[in-house]
From Swiss-Prot:
The keyword Isomerase does not apply. Keywords: Amino-acid biosynthesis, Aromatic amino acid biosynthesis, NADP, Oxidoreductase. NADP(+) binds at residues 78, 127-131, 215, 239. NCBIfam families: aroE, PRK00258.1-2. This is Shikimate dehydrogenase (NADP(+)). One of its GO terms (biological process) is shikimate metabolic process. The gene is aroE. InterPro entries: Aminoacid_DH-like_N_sf, NAD(P)-bd_dom_sf, SDH_C, Shikimate_DH, Shikimate_DH-bd_N, Shikimate_DH_fam, Shikm_DH/Glu-tRNA_Rdtase. Involved in the biosynthesis of the chorismate, which leads to the biosynthesis of aromatic amino acids. Catalyzes the reversible NADPH linked reduction of 3-dehydroshikimate (DHSA) to yield shikimate (SA). The keyword Ribosomal protein does not apply. Shikimate binds at residues 15-17, 62, 87, 102, 217. Belongs to the shikimate dehydrogenase family. It catalyses: shikimate + NADP(+) = 3-dehydroshikimate + NADPH + H(+).
Amino acid sequence: MSDLYCVFGNPIAHSKSPAIHAAFAVQTAQDLRYEARLAALDGFGLAIAEFVAVGGKGANVTVPFKEEAYRLATRLSDRAARAGAVNTLVFDGPEVFGDNTDGAGLVRDITNNLGFSLVGKRILLLGAGGASRGVIAPLLAEKPASLIIANRSADKAVALAQAFADMAPLGGGSFAETAGKSFDLVINATSASLSGASLPLPPGIFAPGSLAYDMMYGKGETPFLTLARQQGAARCADGLGMLVEQAAEAFFVWRGIRPGTAQVLAELRAKLVA
């Protein structure tokens, strides 16, 4: 019988993960099934128990359950412990192993797919929520020159910077406090693009040759990327590649095989803009 995997979320009907993992399974000749499962907002633990009871081997976790998955895990990877959130679970008897592949997915998309080295770069990370926390350690591992966190409420950005101060001296402050500085990479980890909102970014933050990266994606250009282009970003990229790369990393955690991502990403992109 095929090994069973799934993604938990609420909502979840929009998820591209089943199609991505089905493509990975075919490509790597792995015998598995992967489905989307809706968990009640107050019933994530029960949904996990029911899935394990029917033979579930592992699961991805998306909004709004990543922090709850972190608390539910009996063992954590270093990157999940750092992130304070879990997006990948492995079920092995009574043990629940929690991992976080978001940061690895982001870094691999930027460095491999986009060919943009992070070594020695000045990085601005917009947002101080869970999406930002999950990617800071993997970004710092690439040895950038600096990493500054900016947020609407400066105190949250400062607190997040302090949480990773043992890894590198990070900066934290408000969006307005980035005025007069320029960056090689600006990453939008806020949810502003979901609501169609634009961020109050001061002009001049995009250095020559800079990359603007939005973790969100959609049929058209996100408001952040439109603003970035207007303000002089040399290159713009959305988060579809990050989605595929974090899925590939989760597939590797489960199966020990790293699938290729180029064709899967190209097919998803074609469907998105069709």
